[in-house]
């Protein structure tokens, strides 16, 4: 009898331990604790990854963390995958990571120092590692781009891999956006056929935070509008037949909900492998917070209508459903 009781208690304890795991069917928003912004989403191997900006005073933004998950529910933190100790020319404002896996290595593009003119040191850099969780080290020993071009501040870089294999860097703050052709080894830029290097593709309303993807042969260009420190930060988009546009603004797809959060913006998308399931990863400010740096990383479903237009995203507290664990 005692043995049966012990077995029963053990079974009940095991069931109790497992129940919370099975009961959690939604990710919840925010995805993980802490103030993090400008999230870059990616899929590497059997894990989803998020690379955000650590949201604090510029002088304290001297490192980057990453987060990984197999099912979009449970997220593991990877501390200090990059910090300014590994990038001698960077000393503050490490922002807006963009990640690329190429030739067996992981390239992390980042902005640093928030330069205000061409005389200051900083701009867009590249770090490299053998694993998605790093540690990352400076790839070039200097910025990849440290000058203003077409009025665009060298920040908020996104690396776009086109269908023909070409890699582009789309970037820019101060209401201007450029697209440049990256060299195959990411050490610099290649000129276009006309000899130019920087092509401006700024759409109406653009402020910062560009993102591009292809779906059904169309190029979707997304960006953030408004001030990042205020409640009206938002995401708009356009569609074109080329990565060079022209991009005519269609409308807003992500914005605040007075019942949920404010300042929803600076996003990226994750397309679940082998599916047409899309998730928007973004930051927002909880209703309880007013400090501009109190931004949290969240995820919600992104969907399209029959014409391929993006449906307005409903920001939620629930987040997204558990995804089938990824396998290699």
Each model region followed by its residue ranges:
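Carbohydrate-active catalytic/glycan-binding domains of CAZyme proteins
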Residues: 23-328
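Bacterial Sec-dependent N-terminal signal peptides
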Residues: 1-25
């Amino acid at each position: 009898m005692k043995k049966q009781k012990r077995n029963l208690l053990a079974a009940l304890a095991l069931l109790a331990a497992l129940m919370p795991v099975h009961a959690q069917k939604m990710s919840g928003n925010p995805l993980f604790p802490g103030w993090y912004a400008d999230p870059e989403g990616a899929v590497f191997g059997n894990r989803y990854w998020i690379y955000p900006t650590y949201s604090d005073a510029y002088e304290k933004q001297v490192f980057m963390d990453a987060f990984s998950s197999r099912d979009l529910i449970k997220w593991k933190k990877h501390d200090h995958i990059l910090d300014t100790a590994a990038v001698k020319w960077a000393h503050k404002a490490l922002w807006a990571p963009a990640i690329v896996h190429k030739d067996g290595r992981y390239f992390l593009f980042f902005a640093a120092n928030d330069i205000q003119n061409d005389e200051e040191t900083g701009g867009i850099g590249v770090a490299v590692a053998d694993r998605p969780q790093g540690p990352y080290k400076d790839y070039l020993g200097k910025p990849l781009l440290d000058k203003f071009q077409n009025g665009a501040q060298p920040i908020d870089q996104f690396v776009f891999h086109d269908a023909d294999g070409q890699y582009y860097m789309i970037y820019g703050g101060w209401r201007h956006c450029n697209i440049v052709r990256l060299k195959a080894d990411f050490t610099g830029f290649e000129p276009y056929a006309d000899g130019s290097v920087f092509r401006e593709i700024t759409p109406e309303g653009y402020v910062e935070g560009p993102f591009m993807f292809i779906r059904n042969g169309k190029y979707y260009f997304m960006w953030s509008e408004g001030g990042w420190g205020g409640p009206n930060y938002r995401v708009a988009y356009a569609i074109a037949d080329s990565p060079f546009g022209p991009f005519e603004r269609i409308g807003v797809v992500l914005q605040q909900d007075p019942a949920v959060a404010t300042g929803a913006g600076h996003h990226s998308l994750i397309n679940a492998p082998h599916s047409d399931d899309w998730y928007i990863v973004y930051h927002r400010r909880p209703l309880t917070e007013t400090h501009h740096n109190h931004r949290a990383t969240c995820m919600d479903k992104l969907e399209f209508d029959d014409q391929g237009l993006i449906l307005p995203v409903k920001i939620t507290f629930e987040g997204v459903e558990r995804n089938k664990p990824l396998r290699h």
